[in-house]
Amino acid sequence: KECMADGTVCYIHNHNDCCGSCLCPNGPLARPWEMLVGNCKCGPKA
């Protein structure tokens, strides 16, 4: 299965599809909400 390139918006349902990690700006507590609203993007593996 293809993985999503860095810079692609990642959501709860597909954050594991990033080639690297799904990176969210405001840390772990806000993460579920940020994924919901589309604030997270695929980036290099953490």
UniProtKB/Swiss-Prot annotation:
Lineage summary: Eukaryota, Metazoa, Ecdysozoa, Arthropoda, Chelicerata
Keyword Disulfide bond: yes
Keyword Secreted: yes
A Pfam cross-reference name: Toxin_28
InterPro entries named in the record: Insecticidal_knottin-like_sf (IPR053718), Toxin_28 (IPR012633)
GO molecular function: toxin activity
Family recorded in the similarity comment: Belongs to the neurotoxin 16 (SFI) family.
Disulfide cross-links: C3-C19, C10-C22, C18-C42, C24-C40
Record's comment describing the protein's domains: The presence of a 'disulfide through disulfide knot' structurally defines this protein as a knottin.
Region (Keys region for toxin activity): 31-33
The entry's keywords: Disulfide bond, Knottin, Secreted, Toxin
Protein name from the UniProt record: Mu-segestritoxin-Sf1h
Tissues expressed in: Expressed by the venom gland.
Subcellular location field: Secreted
Function per UniProt: Insecticidal toxin. It inhibits insect voltage-gated sodium channels (Nav) by partially blocking the channel pore in DUM neurons from the American cockroach, not by acting as a gating modifier. The inhibition is only partially reversible after prolonged washout. In vivo, the toxin causes flaccid paralysis followed by death when injected into Heliothis virescens larvae. It also causes uncoordinated movements followed by full paralysis to sheep blowflies (Lucilia cuprina).
Gene3D superfamilies registered for this protein in UniProt: 4.10.40.60
GO-annotated cellular components: extracellular region
